[in-house]
């Protein structure tokens, strides 16, 4: 808490004493009887608070007995202590003074004594975050008499009754046991070390003897707390002052200067000192009482001494006050009496615990500014948990703190920025807003809220609701759902124009809840008694108040009814919440049975029509009020709570991780449960009812994600419960209902196209039921495999559904933002069934048929095929041939689905399919090759499928004999030729390779290449095939293909690095090696296709180095002469080369820069070498140079370089 160095402000109340003052001087220390010190036993806590002196005495005696060591007797508590304690809890001291003219001093002392808080739980609550659930003790009285350790005058009378070891153990119990909330998270300033929490540090300071000079003057406690020296910090002494009233701390100050939301460790230490060691605290009456007993001389001496001791601080103020008092017309003389900071609260003062509003606002502002980083979301969730803890303690600061938090949320500048940019807020931030709205629902539904307080909240909520940036309930769009307090519109009412409805914000439901009340007599009877029945009531109508067994029912909009349960839990009424929850669940079960009977009747009357209207446009799972989660948590909490001392629960909803260590017990049945039923069975059944409800997929990304997230959270909670025979019966019962209940069930025969899919829920049901009822498990899972939103047409029976649904639920696809997640869940369900069906041919066939019918994603089917393959080929068992065939069948479907579409995993899929077919057997390989055109592209069929099938590894893997090898080879050759005919450009080479061993097939493939060479094949493909032919020992065929490739080629003058140059050189070398005729035939093609001078000169030189045909590829030698450059065909090549140099030179000179001059001179040098190969080359080159000098004489520097080199 933001403690400040100055003293607390003086009390507002003005104190004066008329002439017959109270109390004799020096009066004693209270009654001699000295009753128990903070007597408040946990047994007094349940239900309505104990009233009257007798109840207080009984509680006090029980507590005192618990505090005394064995063997000591306990005297009865005095009437003075009983009365004083009750007065101290309920009345402000001013009312006591006004009520009684004279109050004896012993009575004043006992009232002052009992006015300090007696529960350490509240001190802990205001000095640390709460990360666990509430304690088993439940909320304490408004007076603060909670479930912590209480010490009072009884302990004081006999001295300290605890040893140091016992004190230490008690401190640990207070910090970690059921007496206080568990604290496991750090505050914003303390990081993650639990020992640094203010409450823990306060206990450590107290037990280390660091608290000193403790003084209680009236309703004011002061003392010093010494902070031990910790290097490099020196020892510090903090002055602490605490004001209190009616067992609540109303203000705190500490000189440590620490600023935080919660009390600092020094305040904690002083408070716990007063609670644990009240006998060691000097107690004085309010200072005004002491002053009243002084005469004039004593008063003057008192004032002068006070000024002398503190003259530097007090003197200016003292002189100012003296001047005002001496002035007759001063304001101070217009008021009777004077303020007394130790005299307690006035009648008008609000009685609540001290909460530093400024620091709450500042901390929330800091957390929000961090934008979700540094654990700010966690810190804000802890603040929300603190609000819930305060509500459970029935502390008015809960609503006050939530108001401060909400104001900072509404002032977050990011809200307007997101609204302007049209972007959605982050998911974590959105969840914080949801929790904010849920907390306001709890607050306005407080069953004991005063009307004026509710009116104040309503006004504030409407103010926030009207702000433009106030977030919408559905995250992105205005919700079209009906009001909170009304049932869902059906029939003609459903046609109302939803576009005219205002947007619903996160506060809308809380605003609507302000209209709800708790005065209904039936509701009051339900929550107040376990014996509320009417066995004579036989009304069996839809809205009857009792069922046929006489048990009470509660008919209300289900989320609203569950919001009441949550409000009762949150405000510390767990028994009442449980009673209402049971009534709601019994109502749901009765409605479920009536829905089943109604559907069966309609089905008989209309046997050829299917009813598919959705009765729940507003689903319970993912609902902003989380009705199913509320009922489930309320019932599950009762499973591990003693029914006889039922006063509160640990919060299993807020911290489900802790509940894993709890064992859920089937406690004795409640009055309104069937024989053999328990809270566990009821919780599980209501969860199954909610999860199986048919409901429309909501609009907007956030709400759709919330539906998925809440469903998974609820299922994860169910999975923590171990199934026994009783729960299995519940599962069977609900599974049968889901299958037979028609439009009321998400697993009915025919559902609406936009219904939320049941894949995740069905997977849980399947795995749960499989060991107990496999047939039912498979029925559920197979029915849930549907994903109608992806179907091109609705089911036939859907055509006869009531048409009013269409206006309420428009066709929104593809606005299913979570579709990819839904499809993955569908895939998980199918994979689970495949795994379970291993070895069962009939089940596998059924599952396969369902997959092929309902899954529309090729990637998910491929994943299923892979999963099935892995399961079928586990290392520790023989391959399951049936499951392998299923895997292959799924793979074939993937091939067909992706054949005409682009898929980056296609090559992986093809390779995997061949692997799978190999495992199935040779007939599978033969089958996919024979029907390749429905599965693969020609390229895939030749380069991957046929090549892999013909590989040695496949032959070895399958242990094929010669006959089988030949059969596969024949199929592969047929495939290759078909592919080459269809796509010669990409398949010709593969076809030739595959047909090598069969002469006829090879010739056929070669002819296909020749036929395609003149039309569609590129020079690159032809050169590749030509090189292959040369490699296989067919030089003439290679030459033929090379000449065909040359006709498609075109190299310009500047493409001296073209990738085809090597192919051209290879083709010329091949022709040269074959003989003069072949060379003579290819040179005209080269001259026509190649314009690059350097390439032509390279070819020319290679042709002049050896005799044509001198070393043929076939090994023969030719002793002919070198070819002459003056005769064909080399003369034509030489002229073309010279011409290319001339043209290239002019082209380069057109756009030459000085930095390229030296490179150009080198180019001319190479050109001269080529010129000189002709018999008149010298003359030609000289003329060429002269011509350049004349044409480009403007390039003086360049021409000068030309002259220097070439003359």
Curated annotation (Swiss-Prot):
Gene Ontology terms: biological process: neuron projection morphogenesis; regulation of neuron migration; striatal medium spiny neuron differentiation
GO cellular component, one term: stereocilium
InterPro entries: Znf_SWIM (IPR007527), ZSWIM4-8_C (IPR048370)
Top-level division of the source organism's lineage: Eukaryota
Positions of SWIM-type zinc fingers: 238-275
UniProt cross-references to Pfam families, sorted A to Z: ZSWIM4-8_C
Keywords, ordered alphabetically: Metal-binding, Neurogenesis, Zinc, Zinc-finger
Region listing for Disordered, in residue ranges: 1-52, 134-163
GO terms, molecular function: zinc ion binding
Tissue expression per record: Mouse embryos and newborn mice shown expression in the central nervous system (at protein level).
Keyword Zinc annotated: yes
Function recorded in the entry: involved in nervous system development, important for striatal morphology and motor regulation.
The protein's name in its UniProt record: Zinc finger SWIM domain-containing protein 6
Gene source species: Mus musculus
């Amino acid at each position: 808490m933001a403690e400040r160095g100055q003293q607390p402000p003086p009390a507002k109340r003005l104190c004066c004493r008329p002439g017959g003052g109270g109390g004799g001087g020096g009066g004693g220390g209270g009654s001699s009887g000295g009753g128990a010190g903070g007597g408040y036993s946990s047994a007094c806590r349940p239900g309505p608070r104990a009233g009257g002196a007798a109840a207080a005495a009984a509680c006090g005696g029980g507590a005192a007995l618990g505090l005394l060591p064995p063997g000591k007797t306990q005297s009865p508590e005095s009437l003075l202590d009983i009365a004083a304690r009750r007065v101290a809890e309920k009345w402000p001291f001013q009312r006591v003074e006004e009520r009684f003219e004279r109050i004896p001093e012993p009575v004043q002392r006992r009232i002052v004594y009992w006015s300090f808080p007696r529960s350490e739980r509240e001190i802990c609550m205001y000095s640390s975050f709460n990360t666990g659930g509430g304690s088993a003790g439940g909320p304490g009285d408004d007076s603060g008499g909670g479930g912590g350790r209480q010490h009072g005058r009884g302990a004081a009378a006999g001295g300290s009754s605890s040893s140091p070891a016992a004190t230490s153990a008690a401190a640990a119990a207070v910090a970690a046991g059921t007496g206080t909330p568990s604290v496991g998270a750090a505050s914003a300033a303390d990081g993650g070390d639990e020992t640094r929490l203010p409450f823990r540090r306060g206990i450590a300071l107290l037990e280390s003897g660091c608290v000193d000079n403790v003084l209680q003057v009236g309703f004011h406690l002061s003392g010093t707390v010494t902070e031990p020296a910790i290097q490099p910090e020196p020892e510090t002494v903090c002055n602490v002052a605490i004001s209190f009233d009616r067992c609540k701390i109303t203000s705190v100050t500490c000189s440590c200067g620490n600023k935080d939301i919660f009390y600092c460790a020094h305040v904690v230490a002083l408070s716990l000192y007063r609670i644990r060691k009240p006998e060691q605290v000097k107690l004085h009456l309010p200072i005004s009482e002491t002053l009243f007993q002084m005469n004039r001389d004593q008063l003057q001496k008192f004032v002068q001494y006070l000024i002398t001791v503190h003259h530097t601080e007090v003197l200016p103020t003292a002189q100012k006050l003296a001047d005002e008092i001496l002035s007759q017309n001063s304001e101070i003389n217009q008021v009777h009496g004077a303020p007394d900071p130790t005299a307690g609260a006035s009648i008008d003062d609000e009685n609540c615990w001290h909460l530093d509003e400024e620091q709450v606002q500042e901390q929330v502002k800091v957390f929000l500014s961090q934008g979700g980083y540094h654990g700010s979301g966690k810190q804000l969730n802890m603040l929300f948990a603190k609000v819930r803890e305060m509500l459970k303690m029935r502390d008015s600061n809960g609503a006050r703190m939530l108001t401060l938090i909400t104001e900072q949320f509404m002032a977050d500048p990011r809200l307007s920025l997101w609204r302007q940019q049209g972007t959605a807020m982050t998911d974590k931030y959105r969840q914080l807003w949801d929790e904010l709205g849920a907390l306001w629902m709890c607050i306005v539904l407080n069953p004991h809220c005063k009307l004026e307080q509710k009116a104040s909240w309503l006004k504030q909520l409407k103010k926030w609701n009207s702000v433009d940036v106030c977030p919408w309930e559905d995250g992105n769009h205005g919700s079209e759902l009906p009001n909170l307090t009304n049932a869902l519109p059906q029939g003609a009412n459903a046609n109302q124009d939803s576009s005219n409805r205002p947007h619903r914000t996160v506060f809308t439901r809380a605003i609507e809840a302000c209209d709800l009340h708790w005065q209904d007599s039936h509701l009051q009877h339900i929550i107040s008694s376990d014996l509320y029945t009417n066995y004579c009531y036989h009304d069996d109508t839809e809205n009857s108040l009792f069922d046929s067994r006489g048990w009470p029912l509660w008919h209300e909009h289900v989320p609203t009814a569950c919001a009441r349960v949550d409000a009762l839990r949150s405000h510390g009424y767990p028994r009442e919440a449980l009673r209402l929850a049971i009534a709601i669940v019994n109502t749901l079960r009765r409605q479920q049975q009536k829905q089943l009977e109604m559907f069966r009747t309609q089905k008989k009357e209309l046997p050829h029509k299917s009813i598919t209207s959705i009765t729940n446009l507003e689903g319970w799972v993912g609902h902003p009020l989380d009705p199913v989660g509320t009922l489930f948590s309320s019932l599950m909490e009762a499973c591990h709570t003693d029914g006889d001392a039922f006063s509160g629960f640990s919060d299993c909803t807020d911290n489900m991780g802790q509940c894993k260590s709890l064992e859920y017990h089937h406690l004795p049945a409640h009055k309104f449960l069937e024989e053999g039923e328990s809270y566990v069975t009821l919780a599980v059944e209501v969860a199954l009812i909610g999860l199986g409800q048919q409901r429309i997929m909501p609009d907007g990304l956030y709400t759709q994600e919330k539906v998925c997230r809440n469903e998974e959270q609820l299922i994860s909670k169910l999975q923590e419960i171990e199934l026994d025979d009783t729960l299995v019966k519940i599962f069977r019962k609900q599974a049968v209902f889901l299958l037979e209940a028609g439009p009321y069930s998400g697993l009915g025969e025919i559902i609406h196209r936009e219904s939320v899919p049941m894949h995740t829920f069905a997977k849980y049901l399947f795995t749960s039921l499989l060991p107990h009822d496999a047939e039912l498990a498979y029925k559920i899972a197979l029915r849930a495999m549907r994903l109608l939103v992806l179907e091109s047409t609705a089911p036939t029976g859907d055509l006869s559904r009531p048409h009013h649904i269409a206006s309420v639920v428009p066709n929104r696809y593809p606005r299913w933002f979570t579709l990819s997640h839904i499809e993955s869940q569908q895939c998980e369900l199918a994979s689970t069934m495949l795994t379970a069906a291993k070895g069962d041919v009939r089940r596998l066939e059924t599952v396969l048929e369902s997959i092929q019918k309902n899954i529309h994603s090729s990637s998910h089917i491929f994943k299923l095929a892979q999963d099935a393959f892995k399961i079928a080929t586990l290392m520790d068992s023989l391959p399951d041939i049936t499951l392998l065939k299923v895997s292959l069948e799924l793979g074939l479907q993937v091939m067909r689905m992706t054949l005409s579409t682009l898929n980056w995993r296609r090559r992986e899929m093809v390779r995997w399919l061949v692997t799978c077919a190999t495992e199935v057997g040779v007939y599978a390989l033969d089958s996919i090759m024979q029907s390749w055109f429905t599965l693969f592209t020609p390229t895939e069929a030749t380069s991957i499928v046929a090549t892999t099938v013909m590989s040695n590894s496949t032959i070895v893997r399958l242990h094929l004999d010669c006959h089988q090898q030949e059969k596969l080879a024949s199929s592969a050759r047929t495939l290759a030729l078909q592919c080459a005919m269809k796509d010669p450009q990409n398949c010709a080479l593969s076809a030739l390779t595959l047909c090598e061993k069969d002469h006829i097939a090879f010739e056929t493939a070669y002819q296909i290449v020749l036929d395609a060479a003149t039309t569609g094949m590129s020079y690159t493909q032809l050169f590749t095939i030509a090189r292959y032919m040369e490699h296989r020992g067919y030089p003439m065929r290679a030459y033929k293909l090379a000449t065909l490739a040359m006709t498609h080629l075109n190299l310009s003058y500047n493409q001296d690095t073209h990738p085809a140059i090597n192919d051209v050189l290879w083709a010329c070398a091949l022709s040269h090696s074959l003989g003069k005729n072949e060379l003579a035939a290819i040179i005209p093609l080269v001259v026509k296709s190649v314009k690059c001078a350097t390439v032509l000169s390279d070819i020319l030189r290679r042709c002049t180095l050896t005799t044509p045909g001198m070393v043929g590829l076939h090994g023969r030698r030719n002793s002919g002469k070198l070819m002459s450059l003056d005769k064909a065909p080399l003369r034509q090549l030489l002229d073309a080369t010279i011409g290319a140099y001339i043209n290239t030179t002019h082209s380069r000179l057109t756009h030459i820069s000085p930095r390229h001059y030296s490179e150009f001179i080198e180019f001319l040098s190479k050109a001269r070498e080529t010129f000189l190969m002709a018999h008149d080359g010298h003359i030609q080159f000289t003329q060429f140079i002269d011509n350049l000098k004349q044409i480009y004489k403007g390039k003086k520097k360049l021409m000068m370089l030309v002259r220097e080199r070439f003359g």
